Amino acid sequence: MRFFPSFQSATRNFASGLKQQFAGKFSAPNLATPYNSGIRGVWIPSTDCKVLTSKQRIADAMDFLADTGFNTVFPVVWNRGFTAYPSQIMREQFGTEIDARYQGRDPLAELIIEANRVGLKVIPWFEYGFVSSYNLNGGHLLAQKPEWAARDCNGNLLKKNKFEWMNSLDPEVQDFLLGLMLEVARNYPVNGVQGDDRIALPCEGGYDAKTVKRYLQECGREAPQNPREQHWLHWRAGIITEFVARLHRELKAINPDLLLSMSPSPYEWGLVEYLQDSKSWVDKKLVDLLHPQFYRRDFNGYKQLVDRLIDRQLTCEQLHCVSPGVLLANRGSNYSMNPELLLQVIAYNRARGIPGEVLFFYEGLRDNGNALAEALKNGPYAR
């Protein structure tokens, strides 16, 4: 890695220490086991969710999910510029090994142990991707590395929906995030890693001097002021696709059975707004699992996204890798899905040949006296 020459030796030492610390507690993940009945997954965030705050809460959550019928958990490990595991890269680059909330612990290791105990697969979720901060003017990452900032056409720090962005088109920034994801894949017995809808860049970005110069050199034209101009948009989306390809290639070099999971915004909106060409990712076989975020609060809205995906975007042969993201709850808007809608959504997935889904998020299962969990346990997730 260009930004961290001692990466290989450092991660070897780190992994050795980790294995000693948790000797006998990890069991090797069964990477090759296919999802014969589809993914029944759930995201475990650190925002509006207390699961990761203690070993006991982690153990209780894994028991609850296994009893409900889930087979995969996606725990957050990268959020607001900090990791939920002790990171050699973060210590070397930013002097902060782990999120301060978890000082003296390793929530990822604790969760893997408990998930193994009840037979759940673990795919760590890099929620923030190329985002540096939320409403903090770039946060500690860009305070220390201002050259990593993404820029809009006016030269300002790129912000969208209060999120501030690193420049995901910059090779050094790409090396950093890739390093974090491979660090987890090398050092923990996981089933894969997951990128979110922030393995992306808002289309308004890419106007930093380095990227504009690269565009001129490669394409012989100036970057247009219109961020949605087709050539400029697809050129930048291609750089994101190249990053996904590199991530896939280097993940498989660690272990060919490790899964690359991606959860992009719905195509084509994700392409136009966030440079996520998820159709190309699938066409080029760069992802093993795709969880487009079909976060709709009514059945017809969800159905339209599924129909568009199946009828216009993917082939029948590609459908096996798809498990859409389904919105169970949103604390900001006080939304909680009702059991009837959840069962209707899952039934439609199966009717259209979609074998599974990933639910956002864990706490939604516990709302209203575990109403959604009970509906799953007594219905489509019954053993």
PLM region spans:
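Boundary/entry segment of secreted carbohydrate-active catalytic domains
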Residues: 29-54, 264-266, 329
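Catalytic domains of carbohydrate-active enzymes, especially glycoside hydrolases
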Residues: 57-83, 356
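Aromatic- and acidic-residue-enriched segments that line the glycan-binding/catalytic groove
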Residues: 85-97, 130-159, 195-224
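Active-site-adjacent "subsite" loops/lids of carbohydrate-active enzymes
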Residues: 37-41, 49-52, 129-187
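Substrate-binding cleft of secreted/luminal carbohydrate-active enzymes
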Residues: 288-302, 320-383
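Glycoside hydrolase catalytic-domain groove-lining segments
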Residues: 218-334
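Aromatic-lined substrate-binding rim segments of carbohydrate-active enzymes
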Residues: 79-127, 232-247, 251
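The substrate-binding groove and active-site-proximal loops of carbohydrate-active enzymes
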Residues: 43-52, 90-104, 161-175, 229-240, ...
